From Swiss-Prot:
Ranges of Gly residues composition bias in the record: 567-576, 642-652, 675-721
Cysteines engaged in disulfide bonds, as pairs: C284-C322
Primary localization class, coarse: secreted
TM ranges: none
Task performed by this protein: May play a role in cell adhesion.
Protein name, as recorded: Adhesin AWP1
Expression induction or repression: Induced during biofilm formation.
Organism: Candida glabrata (strain ATCC 2001 / BCRC 20586 / JCM 3761 / NBRC 0622 / NRRL Y-65 / CBS 138) (Yeast)
Signal sequence interval, chain numbering: 1-18
Encoding gene per record: AWP1
Composition skew (Low complexity), residue ranges: 331-566, 577-641
UniProt entry keywords in alphabetical sequence: Cell adhesion, Cell wall, Disulfide bond, Glycoprotein, Secreted, Signal
Lineage: Eukaryota, Fungi, Dikarya, Ascomycota, Saccharomycotina
Region (Disordered): 329-835
Compartments it resides in: Secreted, Cell wall
C-alpha cells in the first residue's frame, strides 16, 4: 500500500467519533476502546489484564505517549490491535509486563490493517515459559517503519527448558515489511522475520539470541550481530544480504545439505552453497583461514532442517571497507573500433578502424593505451600473455583480406578470454566492401572495461564497421596505426607479417591484419590461463612494449608469428625489398617473377620487469624499561628504655614491751612469786614495687626488711601487804629481761613492816620472772626494673624473730617475674573495750594479720591496780 493510501486511510478514520486525550490521563483496570483513540498528551493504563484497541490508535505529536502496564501477578496479559484497527505512532508506545511464573502467559498481538511508525514502539516484557502458550506478533497488512521498534527484557523465567519462550514474530509470508528505521531485538532466544523485506536504509540489530529469516527478498536492510548472536536464512534470496558485526562466537546458518563456503577477500562476499546459493556481504578484511563450516540440524517453527553453519573465529577487522574493484568489465562497455588503421598506401578515411583499447604485454588493458580519452580501459583488466594467438596461424598465400569476417557480437573480453580472430586472409587482391567489423561485441564484466569507457569511433567507420577500402595496392603494405603509442602502454607489438605476396598487378594491402592499435575482439571467454585458438591467421602472438607506429618490424621475439608461406612476385616482408619487375621478354614474355622479400624478423622479446625491491626491514621494538627498584622498608625503632624499678625494703617494727603478768601472795613466811611474759611485735617488712622497664634490665635492689626489736616486758611482782592474820604480799622488783635470754628472775620484793594490827608479821619474800618472746615475720616480693639490657632479679622476703636472746635479721630478694607483695604483721596496743570485765579475753583486730589473745596481760594489769588501791 502506498503512502497516499495510508494517509487517506487515516484521514477517513479521523471522521469517526474519537476519544481525544488532550491532557495527561490515567485509566485503571481492563480497557476496551471501540472508538478511535487520539492521544495528543499522555495516556497511562494501569492494573489491567487486557487492553484492546479495536479502531484507530493515533499517537501524535512526538511528545505524546501511551503506556500500558500489566496488572501485577496476573497470569494472562493481553494487548491487542486487531485487523480492524490501525496504528499511527509519531510519539511513544510502551507495552510493559513484568509478570513471570510457570503458568504466566502474554499475548501481544499487533496485527492492524496499517501500521505506520515514525516514533518509538517498545515491548518491555518478562520471559514467559513457551511460545505455544504465549503469542508475540507484529504483523500488519501494511508495515511502514521509519522509527524504532524495541523488544527488551525486564525479567527472567527459568521454566523454559526448550528455550522457546518469548519468540517475537515480525511479518508473515506474502507480506512486505518496509523498514527504513531500526528494529532492536534484545529479549529472547529466538526471533522470526518473515515476508519480503525492502527499503535501502533499514537496520535490524540482533543483540541477543538467534534471528531466523524466511523471506522471498531481502533488499537494502543491514543485519547487525552482537556477541554470541546468530543469523539463519531458511531459504536463499536473490540478493546479497548485508551482515555486519561478524566475529568470535557468531554463526551464519544457511538451510541445506552438503554445504560449502567461500570468502572473497576483494569483495567481502561470503558465499555458502547448499541446495541453493546464499550470499552474505560481511565486509572485507577477514581471514578465510579463520573461518570454519559444519553441517548441523536446525529447528524452525517446529520443523527440523539440515543446515550448514559458518563460524568466524576472529575479531571484527578494523576496516571493513573493500578497495574499489575496477577490474570488472561490465557488459555495457562495448568496444567499438575507434583507432584508424592507416596503411602506408592511400586508405580512404572511411575504412579506418580505431581500436578502443590496447593490450599490454603484462596482459593488462590500460586506459593510457587507448587512442581516445573516452575509451578508458581500466588497468586492472588484463588479458594474460598466455591468451595469445598461437603462432601456428599463418597468412595463407592465396588468401585475400576479407573484412566480411566480422568480429562476432557475442565475443567478450574477460580477463581469461583469448583473442580469436575469425577473419581469414584470402588471396583476392581486394578488400571486399562487404566486410564489416561489427562493434557489438561487448566486453564481459570480468575484464575491467567500465561501462563508461566504450570506444567511440573516431573515423568514418559506421556502427556496423563495414570497411570498404578502395585501397591502392602498395608493395610495402604495412599496417600503421595513426595513433601515437605510449611505450608505457604496451600493445600487441608483433603485427601479423603477411607472407603471401601478391603480384604487382594486384597486391593486397594487409589491412585486415591486427595492427598494434586495433586489438582483435575475442569470441570466447576463457580463464586467464586458456590459450586462444585462432580460427585464422593475422593475430599477434607476442607483446612488445617498445614498438611504435613506424611500420618497422619489431625486434625478434620468441612468441612472434613465424611466416610459414611465401609467394613469388609479391610484396616483400617488412625488411625484404620487393622483387624487381620482370623485364619484358622477347615476343612479349613477362619478366621473371620478383623474388619474395626476406621474412620479417620477430620482435625483440619483452624485457623482464625490474625485480621488486625488498621491503624495509622492520624496526626492532623498543627495549622494555626495567621496573623501578623497590624501596627498603623503614627500620623499626627500638623500644624506649625502661626505667629501673625502685625496690624498697620492708620497714622495721619495734615491738612493744611485753607486759609482765605477775601474781603475789603473802602468808606469813610464805614467799611470793611473780612471773611476766611479753610478746614482741613483729616488724612489717615492706617489699619495693619494681616497675617493669621497656627493654632495659633494671638492677633490682632488694629492700632491707628490718626485724623489729622485741623488748622484754618488765614483770612487776605484786606487793603483798601483810595484814592481820595475813601475810603481806611482797612486791617483786621489776626484773629486766636479759638481752641474752629474754628471761629474768625478779629480785625478791622488800616487805613492809607489819602493821599495828599485825606486829608480829614476818617479812615477806617475793620473786619475779619475766619473759618476752618477740615474733615478727614479714615477707615481700617486688619485680626489679629491666635496665641496661641486663635482666635483674630480685625477691623480697622479710622475716624477723625477736627474742631477748637474739636479734632478728632481715633478708630480701627481688624477682623480675612478678611484683613483690609485702605481708606485714603489725602488733598494736590492745585496747579493752569499755565495759569489759576484768579477766575477760579481749580480741583485737590488727591490720594485715589475724587476731591476738591478750589474757595474760589483763591479769598483770589487774594485779597492778590492786597494788595501787592498797
Amino acid at each position: 500500500m502506498s503512502l497516499i493510501t495510508i494517509f487517506a486511510f487515516f484521514i477517513k478514520a479521523t471522521l469517526v467519533l474519537s476519544l481525544d486525550i488532550l491532557t495527561p490521563t490515567t485509566l485503571t483496570g481492563d480497557q476496551t476502546f471501540n472508538e478511535d483513540v487520539s492521544v495528543v498528551s499522555s495516556l497511562t493504563l494501569n492494573d489491567g489484564s487486557q487492553y484492546l484497541f479495536n479502531n484507530l490508535l493515533q499517537i501524535a505529536p512526538s511528545s505524546a505517549s501511551v503506556t500500558a502496564n500489566a496488572l501485577a501477578a496476573v497470569s494472562v496479559f493481553t494487548f491487542s490491535l486487531p485487523p480492524s484497527s490501525s496504528l499511527s505512532n509519531s510519539g511513544t508506545l510502551i507495552i510493559s509486563n513484568s509478570n513471570t511464573g510457570p503458568s504466566t502467559e502474554q499475548h501481544i498481538v499487533i496485527t492492524p490493517n496499517v501500521m505506520a511508525n515514525t516514533g518509538t514502539i517498545t515491548l518491555s516484557l518478562a520471559h514467559t515459559n513457551t511460545d505455544s502458550s504465549s503469542t508475540l506478533i507484529i504483523d500488519p497488512v501494511t508495515f511502514y517503519n521509519t522509527g524504532t521498534i524495541n523488544y527488551e527484557s525486564i525479567g527472567s523465567e527459568t521454566n523454559d527448558p526448550s528455550l522457546t519462550g518469548n519468540i517475537l514474530s515480525i511479518g508473515s509470508s506474502g507480506r512486505t515489511l518496509q523498514n527504513l528505521g531500526t528494529i532492536n531485538l534484545n529479549a529472547a532466544n529466538s526471533y522470526y522475520l518473515l515476508g519480503t523485506i525492502t527499503e535501502n536504509s533499514g537496520s535490524i540489530n540482533v543483540q541477543k539470541g538467534f534471528l531466523y529469516v524466511n523471506a522471498l527478498d531481502f533488499i537494502g536492510n543491514t543485519i547487525n550481530l552482537s556477541t554470541t548472536t546468530a543469523l539463519a536464512f531458511i531459504s536463499p534470496v536473490s540478493q546479497v544480504v548485508r551482515v555486519r558485526g561478524v566475529f568470535f562466537g557468531n554463526i551464519i546458518a544457511s538451510v541445506g545439505s552438503s554445504g560449502t563456503f567461500s570468502y572473497n577477500t576483494q569483495t567481502g562476499i561470503l558465499t555458502v552453497t547448499t541446495n541453493g546459493v546464499y550470499s552474505y556481504d560481511i565486509g572485507c578484511g577477514y581471514n578465510p583461514a579463520l573461518m570454519s563450516g559444519q553441517q548441523e540440524t536446525l529447528s524452525f517453527q517446529g520443523n527440523l532442517y539440515d543446515t550448514f553453519l559458518v563460524l568466524v573465529n576472529q575479531p571484527i577487522p578494523s576496516d571493513l571497507t573493500c578497495a574499489a574493484v575496477s577490474s570488472s568489465i561490465t557488459p555495457s562497455s562495448s568496444v567499438e573500433p575507434s583507432s584508424s588503421v592507416e596503411p602506408s598506401s592511400s586508405v580512404e578515411p572511411s575504412s579506418s578502424v580505431e581500436p578502443s583499447s590496447s593490450v599490454e604485454p603484462s596482459s593488462s588493458v590500460e586506459p593510457s593505451s587507448s587512442v581516445e580519452p573516452s575509451s578508458s580501459v581500466e588497468p586492472s583488466s588484463s588479458v594474460e600473455p598466455s591468451s595469445s594467438v598461437e603462432p601456428s596461424s599463418s597468412v595463407e598465400p592465396s588468401s585475400s583480406v576479407e573484412p566480411s569476417s566480422s568480429v562476432e557480437p557475442s565475443s567478450s573480453v574477460e580477463p581469461s578470454s583469448s583473442v580469436e580472430p575469425s577473419s581469414s586472409v584470402e588471396p583476392s587482391s581486394s578488400v571486399e566492401p562487404s566486410s564489416s567489423v561489427e562493434p557489438s561485441s561487448s566486453v564481459e564484466p570480468s575484464s575491467s572495461v567500465e561501462p563508461s569507457s566504450p570506444a567511440v569511433p573516431s573515423s568514418s567507420a559506421e556502427p556496423s564497421s563495414s570497411v570498404v577500402p578502395p585501397i591502392t595496392p602498395i608493395p610495402s603494405s604495412s599496417v600503421v596505426s595513426a595513433s601515437v603509442f605510449d611505450t608505457s602502454s604496451t600493445l600487441p607489438s608483433s603485427p601479423t607479417v603477411p607472407t603471401s605476396s601478391v603480384s604487382p598487378s594486384s597486391p593486397t594491402v594487409p589491412t585486415s591484419s591486427v595492427s598494434p592499435s586495433s586489438p582483435t575482439v575475442p569470441t570466447s571467454s576463457e580463464s586467464p590461463s586458456t590459450l586462444s585458438t585462432p580460427s585464422s591467421s593475422a593475430a599477434p602472438s607476442s607483446f612488445c612494449p617498445t614498438c611504435v607506429s613506424s611500420g618497422t618490424p619489431p625486434a625478434p621475439s620468441s612468441s612472434a608469428v613465424v611466416p610459414t608461406s611465401s609467394a613469388g612476385g609479391g610484396n616483400g616482408g617488412d625488411n625484404g625489398q620487393p622483387g624487381a619487375d620482370g623485364q619484358p621478354g622477347a615476343a612479349g614474355q613477362p619478366g621473371a617473377a620478383g623474388q619474395p622479400g626476406a621474412a620479417g624478423q620477430p620482435g625483440a622479446a619483452g624485457q623482464p620487469g625490474a625485480a621488486g625491491q625488498p621491503g624495509a626491514a622492520g624496526q626492532p621494538g623498543a627495549a622494555g624499561q626495567p621496573g623501578a627498584a623497590g624501596q627498603p622498608g623503614a627500620a623499626g625503632q627500638p623500644g624506649a628504655a625502661g626505667q629501673p624499678g625502685a625496690g624498697s625494703g620492708g620497714g622495721s617494727e619495734q615491738p612493744t614491751p611485753g607486759a609482765g603478768a605477775g601474781s603475789g601472795s603473802a602468808d606469813g613466811n610464805q614467799s611470793g612469786t611473780s612471773s611476766g611474759t611479753g610478746n614482741g611485735q613483729a616488724g612489717s617488712g615492706q617489699a619495693g614495687s619494681g616497675q617493669v622497664g621497656s627493654g632495659q634490665a633494671g638492677a633490682g635492689q632488694a629492700g632491707s626488711g628490718q626485724a623489729g626489736a622485741g623488748q622484754a616486758g618488765s614483770g612487776q611482782a605484786g606487793a603483798g601487804q601483810a595484814g592481820l592474820d595475813n601475810t603481806a604480799s611482797g612486791q617483786s622488783e621489776g626484773g629486766q629481761a636479759s638481752a641474752m635470754d629474754g628471761d629474768q628472775s625478779g629480785r625478791g620484793g622488800q616487805s613492809n613492816s607489819g602493821s599495828l594490827l599485825q606486829p608480829n608479821a614476818q617479812q615477806g619474800t617475793g620473786s619475779g620472772t619475766g619473759s618476752d618472746t618477740g615474733a615478727d615475720q614479714a615477707s615481700g616480693e617486688s619485680p626489679g626494673q629491666i635496665g641496661d639490657a641486663q635482666p635483674g632479679s630480685g625477691t623480697d622476703q622479710s622475716s624477723g624473730r625477736h627474742s631477748l636472746a637474739a636479734e632478728a635479721r632481715t633478708s630480701q630478694s627481688h624477682s623480675l617475674a612478678a611484683d613483690a607483695r609485702t605481708r606485714s604483721t603489725t602488733r598494736q596496743t590492745s585496747v579493752i573495750a569499755p565495759g569489759t570485765a576484768p579477766g575477760t579475753a579481749v580480741v583485737t583486730t590488727f591490720h594485715g594479720c589475724g587476731t591476738v589473745n591478750h589474757k595474760g596481760m589483763i591479769n598483770i594489769l589487774l594485779a597492778l591496780a590492786l597494788l595501787v588501791l592498797l
